[in-house]
Design a protein with these regions (language model features):
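Iron-sulfur-associated redox domains of electron-transfer enzymes in respiratory
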Residues: 1-146
Length: 146
């Protein structure tokens, strides 16, 4: 079987699929993405991989196949809009766990556009290492719990 055929068939290369909001216009979206990266770094790629959220509504066969083959499907959203959960569900998958940072770690959403015209700030000035760690810990727990 060719690599392309394996992708399309959904050969399970990662035990668990993680789908994340990574909205770069707010602190919650950025924190969600960073926490997922940290969780995969801690767990290893065999245990969990951040999947291509855009591949679900566009019917990218490898993304659909790998999601079908995953033991768990975990969504991580920054805010109550829950875009990643909704996209995953609209693609026909039921998340095993749905993490929402504003709900689950009490994070307050801040739009990066609030500071436009008030001086230049780096994106990371909006991010709390403590909130990234709390979110990462929730993701790791969701992957590891039986």
């Amino acid at each position: 079987m060719s690599e392309q055929q394996q992708w399309e068939a959904g050969v399970n290369t990662h035990e668990n699929a993680v789908f994340s909001c990574f909205g770069g216009a707010s602190n919650t979206g950025i924190t969600s993405g960073l926490a997922c990266l940290e969780a995969v770094k801690e767990l290893g790629l065999e245990k969990a991989a951040i999947m291509c959220l855009g591949g679900l509504p566009t019917n990218v066969k490898p993304v659909l196949g790998k999601t079908r083959a995953a033991k768990k499907v975990i969504t991580v959203d920054g805010c109550p809009f829950e875009c990643s959960r909704k996209i995953v569900e609209q693609a026909g998958f039921k998340p095993t766990s749905s993490i929402v940072l504003t709900r689950d770690i009490g994070m307050k959403k801040k739009s990066l556009s609030e500071d436009i015209g008030k001086g230049i700030k780096g994106v990371m000035d909006y991010i709390s290492d403590d909130e990234v760690k709390k979110a990462k810990d929730l993701i790791v727990k969701a992957v590891l719990e039986e």
